[in-house]
């Protein structure tokens, strides 16, 4: 009956990429450097990651399966450990957020007229919209009319940002 869990994992998608003691956090515009331990960068001296996930349900038929929301993991991410989140132990109302004092505002997302969002299965459409709403562009790039591309699950998504709104211009299945 826990509502949230901690998931400790390995940043396997950047394994072997190396690390630097100073990184450029997107929340600072991508131009200012900070010590890697003061950030959530995956490029660390060890590949360990930690995420707090909403535990939506647990299935126990044929093994144990946890259904979670809010994951910032790649498919196939190696999970090392799972622990319950205990608000009375871990929630610190007087904690200082450092350089991330203001939460980011999600972008409004629209689909270009020539694209039929209805042709995508609803879970894929929702995943694409939620991913683009987080504004995945490099923080220092805010060029109107520039088309950005990113992989979301088995799709390549092309989008642009104009006046604080994301417009999805193309979605193509990626052959894998």
Curated annotation (Swiss-Prot):
State the organism of origin.
Answer: Eikenella corrodens
Record function comment: S-adenosyl-L-methionine-dependent methyltransferase responsible for the addition of the methyl group in the formation of N6-methyl-N6-threonylcarbamoyladenosine at position 37 (m(6)t(6)A37) of the tRNA anticodon loop of tRNA(Thr)(GGU). The methyl group of m(6)t(6)A37 appears to slightly improve the efficiency of the tRNA decoding ability. Binds to tRNA.
Please report which protein family the annotation says this sequence is part of.
Belongs to the tRNA methyltransferase O family.
Record keyword Secreted present: no
Q: Which residues form the TsaA-like domain?
A: 1-94
- GO biological process per UniProt: tRNA methylation
Instruction: Read off the InterPro entries from this record.
Output: TrmO-like_N, TrmO_C, UPF0066_cons_site, YaeB-like, YaeB-like_sf, YaeB_N_sf
Which chemical reaction does it catalyze? N(6)-L-threonylcarbamoyladenosine(37) in tRNA + S-adenosyl-L-methionine = N(6)-methyl,N(6)-L-threonylcarbamoyladenosine(37) in tRNA + S-adenosyl-L-homocysteine + H(+)
**Which UniProt key words apply to this protein?**
Methyltransferase, RNA-binding, S-adenosyl-L-methionine, Transferase, tRNA processing
Keyword flag Transcription:
no
| Residue sites binding S-adenosyl-L-methionine per the record | 12-13, 40, 50, 74-77
Matching Pfam families: TrmO_C (PF18389), TrmO_N (PF01980)
Single GO term (MF): tRNA (L-threonylcarbamoyladenosine(37)-C2) methyltransferase activity
Highest taxon of the lineage = Bacteria
* Gene3D superfamilies for this protein: YaeB-like
Enzyme Commission (EC) number: 2.1.1.-
Protein name according to UniProt = tRNA (adenine(37)-N6)-methyltransferase
């Amino acid at each position: 009956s826990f509502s949230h869990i901690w998931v400790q994992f390995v940043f396997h998608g950047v394994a072997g990429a190396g690390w630097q003691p100073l990184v450029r956090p997107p929340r600072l515009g991508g131009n200012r450097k900070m010590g890697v331990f003061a950030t959530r960068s995956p490029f660390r001296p060890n590949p360990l990651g930690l995420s707090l996930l909403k535990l939506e349900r647990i299935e126990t038929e044929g093994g144990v399966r946890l259904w979670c929301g809010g994951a910032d993991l790649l498919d196939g991410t190696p999970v090392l450990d799972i622990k319950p989140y205990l608000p009375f132990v871990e929630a610190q109302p007087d904690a200082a957020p450092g350089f991330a004092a203001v939460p980011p505002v999600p972008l409004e997302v629209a689909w270009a007229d020539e694209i039929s969002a209805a042709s995508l299965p609803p879970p894929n459409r929702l995943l694409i919209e939620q991913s683009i709403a987080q504004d995945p562009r490099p923080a220092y790039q805010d060029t109107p009319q520039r088309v950005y591309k990113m992989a979301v699950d088995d799709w390549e998504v092309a989008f642009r940002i104009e006046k604080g709104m994301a417009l999805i211009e193309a979605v193509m299945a990626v052959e894998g």
